[in-house]
């Protein structure tokens, strides 16, 4: 998938398409909470495999049972269709 920057109208519609994610100036972000560290780390491991498949890696942090993920396409300087795709796949994993 060749990434392209999302236009203003696409960004306005993005929240409805990827529930739970906040649209920021140059990235999208979401916080995920789990009952313990093992669940949080397991979630991160699943996401790592998706990101590797797309060759697109998030900025993220993990503190015990909390995972915060920030997605942007640094090469293009903002939020792209690839960020949207990965956010959607992350939501699918979280909801399982």
UniProtKB/Swiss-Prot annotation:
Record-level Gene Ontology MF annotations: 4-alpha-hydroxytetrahydrobiopterin dehydratase activity
The keyword Lyase appears for this protein: yes
Keyword Lyase: yes
Reaction(s) catalysed by this chain's protein: (4aS,6R)-4a-hydroxy-L-erythro-5,6,7,8-tetrahydrobiopterin = (6R)-L-erythro-6,7-dihydrobiopterin + H2O
UniProt feature coiled coil, ranges: none
Enzyme Commission (EC) number: 4.2.1.96
GO biological process: tetrahydrobiopterin biosynthetic process
Family under the similarity heading: Belongs to the pterin-4-alpha-carbinolamine dehydratase family.
NCBIfam families hit by this protein: PRK00823.1-3
The protein's name: Putative pterin-4-alpha-carbinolamine dehydratase
């Amino acid at each position: 998938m060749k990434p392209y920057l999302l236009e203003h109208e696409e960004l306005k519609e993005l929240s409805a398409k990827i529930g739970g994610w906040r649209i920021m100036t140059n990235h999208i972000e979401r916080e995920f909470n789990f009952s313990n560290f093992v669940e949080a780390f397991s979630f991160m491991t699943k996401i790592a495999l998706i990101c590797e498949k797309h060759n697109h890696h998030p900025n993220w942090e993990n503190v015990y049972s909390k995972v915060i993920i920030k997605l942007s396409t640094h090469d293009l300087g903002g939020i792209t269709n690839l960020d949207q795709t990965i956010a959607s796949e992350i939501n699918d994993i979280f909801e399982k």
